[in-house]
Amino acid sequence: MNRKKIIVAAVIVALLATLAYGWHYYRQQNDASLTLYGNVDIRTVNLGFRVAGRLASLAVDEGDDIHPGQTLGKLDDGPYLNALKQAQANVQSAQAQLALLKAGYREEEIAQVRSEVAQRQAAFDYADNFLKRQQGLWASKAVSANELENARTARNQARANLQAAKDKLAQFLSGNRPQEIAQAEANLAQTEAELAQAQLNLQDTILLAPSAGTVLTRAVEPGTILSASNTVFTVSLTDPVWVRAYVSERHLGQAIPGSEVEVFTDGRPDKPYHGKIGFVSPTAEFTPKTVETPDLRTDLVYRLRIIITDADESLRQGMPVTVRFPQR
């Protein structure tokens, strides 16, 4: 009987010990802060001119810090200045042509056309009377048929000349046709667009920094003939600075966008940077080879982007970091 009691007591003690260990392990796993490993990810941008030309000068070198709007380099702007002057002249010519069409014809021009109509009328009257005389003479066999035909041809030509002069006078009196004015307006709009493009091209002979950063590479030197979009500088942007890390599915619930984390580097293990989770990938992927955590290397993980809110110059592209989540 005593032996049975001892066995039962031993079983109860073993069960209680197992439960206690399980509870302790559960609390330990849930109370421990999540630690991830990642790398600093700083964006870089390739800067170049939008237009082609000969590189005239560069104002910065590798390692220089730049600020938004700073002049980094210039192209030879001579060809673009000439193009701008030509475009300005074309606009002035188109404006003058449109103004001339809208103003219509001057009184002096109209008077000149009236005089032309009167001259053509007199010429027609003479030719018509001459034809009538020739017709009378032809009836009496005094002129040949050939002479009569010549008189008729001269009369017809005089009539055509008179009609052309009358049409010209009517146009001068009524002004230019709406279609001609519309065409001149379209021509002016085209030359103005060409002028705007010439101005933009001239502006783009100056390379400006789009944002703050540090010059990583200076790819060309003054005197180089560049095509549009050739890389002149490669710049690392100082803002934003991110950390790329990966979390397993088991801990995905702790990686909530907006959550605050601490980021440690080997150079300052006791003074963390602060960051916020800005992005969590919606799709899983196999762990990249760069992940430092051995137990994640065969897992499917989710990529995180952590934005460093107090970044400084000590953070460099690719630097390994440790990301710690606050204890729950």
From Swiss-Prot:
Annotated Gene Ontology cellular components are: periplasmic space
Location, primary (coarse class): periplasm
According to the UniProt entry, the coiled-coil residues are 80-109, 142-209
InterPro entries given for it? CusB_D23, UPF0194_membrane_YbhG, UPF0194_transport
Q: What is this protein called?
A: UPF0194 membrane protein YPTS_1292
What compartments host this protein?
Answer: Periplasm
**Listed NCBIfam families:** PRK03598.1 (NF002939)
Task: Give the similarity note.
Answer: Belongs to the UPF0194 family.
Q: Indicate the secretion signal residues.
A: 1-22
Q: Answer whether the UniProt record assigns the keyword Coiled coil to this protein.
A: yes
Kindly state which keywords UniProt assigns to this record, in alphabetical order: Coiled coil, Periplasm, Signal
Q: Does the keyword Coiled coil belong to this entry?
A: yes
